[in-house]
Amino acid sequence: MYRFAKWFFTLGVLGLVSTSIYSSVGGQNDRAPFPVPLSCYSEDLGSAKFIEAGCDKIHNVENYRDPVGGSVGEILSHRISANSFNLIASLIFLIAILHTFMANKLTAKAHLIHEEHDERMKAAGASEEEIKHDIPFKAELFHFLGEVEVVFGMWVIALLFVTIGFFDWTTFKNYMVYDRVFIEPMFVVVIMAIASTRPVVKFAEQLLGLAAGIGGHSKAAWWFSILLIAPLLGSFITEPAAMTIAALLLANQFYKYKPSSGFAYATIGLLFVNVSVGGTLTHFAAPPVLMVAAPWNWDMGFMAGNFGWKAALGILISNALYFIIFRGQFAKMGKQDDVEASANFDTPEVQTLKPGQISHEEFEARWAERETPIPWWITLVHLCFLAWTVFNAHYPVMFISGMLFFLGFMSLTATHQNKVELKGPIMVGFFLGGLIIHGGLQAWWIAPVLGSLAELPLMLTATILTAVNDNAAITYLATLVPNLAEASKYAVVAGAVTGGGLTVIANAPNPAGQSILGRFFEHGVNPLKLLLGALVPTIIMGICFMVL
């Protein structure tokens, strides 16, 4: 991790943890609610819902009532004029989204600055050691700005000053402490860390190997198995865990062979879409489904009967189509695999190597890929910790405590473990935390848009909105729309999960996948190419949900 970003991430994660813990001790009842509840726009002055939402504490609230019978455009225009903070907060969010699309260009600029700096030092006669340790600040700054996981957290700083300017510090503090819930980012950090350990990944590899065995363990069979079974497992082990395992297996089985750009983006796009819809077999594993399950009384039977089987069929069709398109590349990667097998870490020649005979990085890489067997009881304990985390997904004290015990167990069994990489999970958690902060201020415009549409336009709109806002936020806002028809409820959830692979921010597990696979793309994952890679499976999923 770049030195300039290290403290930023550490303080950010500590802030998320502390605000979530602090929020459990109480609330604030004597101040005006922030952000303005939707009831303050839609309910009459003095009504029960109006009073219950605390609207009577808002200054000039009599000017907030939406125009009766107004169009969506008129309602949004009125809400901006009544509370101009709405527009400013959404503009900051828009800038943050545009920043994510520019991240790979900023990273490329950082590399260029670094290379030019190194060339100047070489020309001045500097040694390799001096060049290695003299990192230009400008390059580090551009690296930092090019980290996708940093973007939303960084723009929270702008939101902080704007909120203080419009209101005061206490308003922002109360919003962070009492209104926002950071359980999901903390859960993702823990589940990613556990799911990426060697025993869990090897177990998943063996499990998926049973399916790949039907195709003779060929590269094509592995690809199909990972992208079919892992996303559907997300309905039971949660989507972030499924994403982590699938991305790690894809990295080891395919991306390390440096496939073509088309194959790389098609595969990551397909992975994001499949994981987004694959969690719909149950009512507790996918964040967008979890948001509506209790308010709308959707249980596991309802989800499997109305969404799950359609998602499974859509995944099968999408995989088959991409398999046909890229079938020529599987044979090529299979030949590369045969060549690499001759240099396996477990051969006697390689096993005699010591860290001093090769670079530390190369030794660590070879050690991480060793095939020595893992005792069954170690794998079992890992799976128990994974199950504990999933079972207690909504209780941070429980799963964080479990994580601490887990780290202790890993140190006791270090011989069978690889290095615990917490950088990726922490950055993903930071990304999601920032998205939660910005997303909480977008209800003023998203809810009227969702509530004004018929079923088909609603599904399409939910799909599009999901690309620029977390799909769980979209479905949560749908629960706030009064008297939403059953067909509309289905449409908004179908649209939200369908569009979950279009961008990194569309679905909570996506940053986890990008964190693992991003290093295989030059200057990081290009948002436009990711969108194109995910577009075809998104259309297929949409048709399955609309027609079947």
Task: List each language-model region with its residue ranges.
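Transmembrane helical segments that form the transport core of multi-pass membrane transport proteins
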Residues: R120, A126-S127, G165-R180, V200-E205, ...
